[in-house]
Amino acid sequence: MNHLRTAVLYTIISAVFLGLGYPLIMTGLAQWIFPRQANGSLIVRNGQVIGSKLIGQTFSGAGYFHSRPSAAGNGYDAESSGGSNLAPTNHALIQQVEQRAAAEQVGATKVPVDLVTASASGLDPDITPAAAYYQAPRIAKARHLPLAAVRKLIAEQTTARQFGLLGEPRVNVLAINLKLDQMH
């Protein structure tokens, strides 16, 4: 009976500490050390939340950089996060990629892969610099801007690898589109 009491007591203490104490301590530390990130890295404009730096959004106008396609529900639905689960040889996936490539095609240049394929999460907020530079002529034409100005903006908005070795260079689509709106 003594072992049973010890086991039950240990279970209750563990549940309280791990189920309540630890999450509250971590939440408090996150709010204290990284308050912006702990609250979702929200981007606010004119007092209104317009998005998160961490969750992609759909941009479809010719004057905006387009995000990666999303397989997460209807657009960038965070509640339906996930890839398409279609194999690379699946005819439906091949057809989707071909349609996206045809829609993005500009001249003889090959469309960067991240403009025609969804990510594993379906919520990526970033594109590669190659995908951004690929879209630059369309954006410059739609906004009546010099191509050099759009290319300069891409260079300024490109984030390097973290610590010089983690990840790949990337461009946050929401951030660069907001900068475009400020330019024009």
From Swiss-Prot:
It is found in: Cell inner membrane. GO terms for cellular component: plasma membrane. One of its GO terms (molecular function) is ATP binding. It is a single-pass membrane protein. Part of the high-affinity ATP-driven potassium transport (or Kdp) system, which catalyzes the hydrolysis of ATP coupled with the electrogenic transport of potassium into the cytoplasm. This subunit acts as a catalytic chaperone that increases the ATP-binding affinity of the ATP-hydrolyzing subunit KdpB by the formation of a transient KdpB/KdpC/ATP ternary complex. Belongs to the KdpC family. It comes from the Bacteria. NCBIfam families: kdpC, PRK00315.1. Its main location: membrane. InterPro entries: KdpC. Pfam families: KdpC. Keywords: ATP-binding, Cell inner membrane, Cell membrane, Ion transport, Membrane, Nucleotide-binding, Potassium, Potassium transport, Transmembrane, Transmembrane helix, Transport. The system is composed of three essential subunits: KdpA, KdpB and KdpC. This is Potassium-transporting ATPase KdpC subunit. The chain crosses the membrane at residues 6-26.
